[in-house]
């Protein structure tokens, strides 16, 4: 029998919701002889206001958790986004593109680098993303850089806004 496929499950969410619940149902039922799953989050949040931590719940079902550091938004990025919103208020499309360009520099590109390194060093076979496509841009770009396929879990029919997300999501 071959070794199980190594899967990195990326969740970019900030709170426990329906996506987290469906993720747990998948993880409880997945065939562990075929899939070796490690979860990757940015935040170890609680289940509800006074519930247990995500890390505790995952440990109970034997799933490892990797927490990637969250970088605080630098002042230059906050100011640049506000200036872009003000100057480009006449064009929603240009305003969104400018804000995305700023987000790419301070938040998304560093996350892509960290995820790419994690995917390569962990010898993963697949990146599974548990949030909507528009919030998973770093996952698409990291998987592409690492040469890995992606599974995107969508609980609703997504509307992709950013051209970069659309190009990444629709690659063969």
Could you describe each region identified by the protein language model?
Residues 148-167:
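A short, histidine- and acid-enriched strand-loop-helix "catalytic/donor-clamping" loop
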Residues 118-125:
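Glycine-rich phosphate-binding loop signature in dinucleotide/nucleotide-binding domains
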Residues 63, 146-149:
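A short helix->loop->beta-strand "cap" motif at the edges of active sites that frequently abuts
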Residues 12-16, 29-99:
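N-terminal strand-loop element at the rim of the active site
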Residues 8, 36-38, 151:
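A structural signal for isolated positions on well-ordered beta-strands in alpha/beta enzyme cores
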Residues 12, 70, 131-132, 154-158:
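Histidine-centered beta-alpha loop that forms part of the nucleotide-sugar donor binding/catalytic region
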Residues 104, 108-112, 127-146, 159:
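An aromatic- and histidine-rich active-site surface loop
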């Amino acid at each position: 029998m071959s070794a199980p496929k190594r899967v990195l499950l990326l969740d970019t969410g900030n709170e426990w919701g329906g996506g987290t619940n469906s993720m747990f149902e998948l993880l409880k039922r997945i065939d562990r002889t075929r899939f070796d799953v490690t979860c990757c989050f940015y935040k170890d949040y609680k289940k509800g206001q006074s519930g247990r931590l995500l890390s505790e719940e995952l440990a109970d079902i034997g799933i490892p958790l990797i927490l990637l550091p969250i970088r605080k938004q630098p002042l230059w990025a906050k100011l640049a986004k506000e200036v872009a919103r003000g100057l480009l208020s006449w064009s929603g499309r240009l305003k969104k593109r400018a804000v995305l360009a700023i987000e790419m520099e301070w938040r998304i590109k560093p996350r892509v680098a960290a995820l790419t390194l994690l995917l390569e060093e962990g010898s993963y076979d697949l990146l599974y993303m548990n949030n909507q496509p528009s919030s998973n841009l770093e996952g698409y770009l990291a998987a592409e850089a690492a040469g890995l396929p992606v599974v995107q879990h969508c609980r609703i029919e997504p509307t992709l806004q950013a051209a970069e997300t659309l190009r990444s999501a629709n690659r063969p």
